[in-house]
Every structure is written in structure tokens, then in C-alpha cells.
């Protein structure tokens, strides 16, 4: 079985929506591998590539979203599942990654390769892995058509490894 490192917080928050569902787990593995291949190394960032990747998924799922750039090519995206009147729960991750010194890697750091049962690649732990964990649960809730007591907002922000102009967007 492929071992995926997901945020303990994410699994705690969604304890009733775990990734025990094999189809969802397989989908999450493929999504993470694909997301790791999206080059968002900062500098220069190019997080708009991550926005395009996530927007395609939202389009396929029929999920409305918005996006904006905090600077040229520094894209941010957010989507919402409407719920009740309680304060919204925000699922936030950043889509930029730091440069990889390839001499310390046995494979392409943007490959999303599975090594010894683990998905490897720049951003797997910080923070694209968390982003896909959030996304898998966000998609599961969207597909379930369950009534929520609060809005659930998925956000991918840019530009965290240099400065934080993203605060204008959020």
C-alpha cells in the first residue's frame, strides 16, 4: 500500500471523511504526483501554473472558484462549498516551493516519483502534500452533497518563500 504523508490536523478535522476510501486514496496519489510536477519553484514562483492545475480540477468537478495574481505569475486560487452560518473553515496551503539542489536528489525533484512507498518531490511535505490532502477531502464533501454547518473554503496562495504580498488577496 502506498504510504502518503498527510497533515495530522487535516485528518483530525476530517475524521469522518478519512482517506480510507480506496478510490479517493488512489485519486489523491495521482493528484499529488501531478501537482508535484507543476514547477512553482520560488524564485521565480510561477504559481499561476498551480492555479491552472487546480482550476482544471474545479472545472471538471463543477466547483466555482476565483483567482487573482498578487504579482505577475504569482497566482492564488480559492473555492467555496457553501454551508450554514457558523464561521467558515479555511483549508489553506501555499503552492510555491523552494529551489532543490539536484546534486542531493537521486531523481528529478519535480517528478512525484514513488520511492519505497512514499511520494517524493519538492513540495511533498511543504506544502503541496497538505494542499492535496485538503483538496481530496474538499472534493469528497462536494461530491457528497452533504449539508454543512459552515462554509468550507479551499485556498492556494503564492509567494510565501520570499515575502508575503498574498495577504492582499486573503
Task: Locate predicted features.
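Acidic/His- and Gly-rich active-site-bordering loop/insert found
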Residues: 21-124, 128, 138-151
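Sec-dependent signal peptide recognition
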Residues: 1-8
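Conserved small/polar residues in nucleotide/adenosyl-binding loops
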Residues: 160-166
Amino acid at each position: 500500500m502506498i504510504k502518503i504523508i498527510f497533515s495530522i490536523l487535516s485528518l483530525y478535522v476530517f475524521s469522518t471523511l478519512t482517506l480510507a476510501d480506496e478510490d479517493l486514496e488512489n485519486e489523491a496519489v495521482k493528484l499529488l504526483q501531478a501537482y508535484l510536477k507543476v514547477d512553482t519553484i520560488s524564485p521565480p514562483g510561477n504559481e499561476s501554473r498551480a492555479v491552472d492545475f487546480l482550476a482544471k480540477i474545479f472545472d471538471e468537478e463543477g466547483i466555482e472558484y476565483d483567482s487573482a495574481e498578487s504579482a505577475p505569475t504569482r497566482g492564488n486560487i480559492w473555492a467555496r462549498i457553501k454551508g450554514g452560518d457558523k464561521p467558515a473553515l479555511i483549508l489553506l496551503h501555499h503552492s510555491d516551493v523552494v529551489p532543490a539542489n539536484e546534486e542531493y536528489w537521486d531523481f528529478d525533484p519535480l517528478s512525484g516519483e514513488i520511492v519505497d512507498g512514499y511520494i517524493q518531490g519538492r513540495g511533498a511535505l511543504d506544502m503541496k502534500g497538505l494542499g492535496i490532502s485538503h483538496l481530496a477531502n474538499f472534493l469528497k464533501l462536494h461530491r457528497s452533497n452533504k449539508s454543512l454547518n459552515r462554509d468550507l473554503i479551499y485556498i492556494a496562495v503564492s509567494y510565501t518563500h520570499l515575502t508575503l504580498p498574498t495577504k492582499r488577496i486573503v
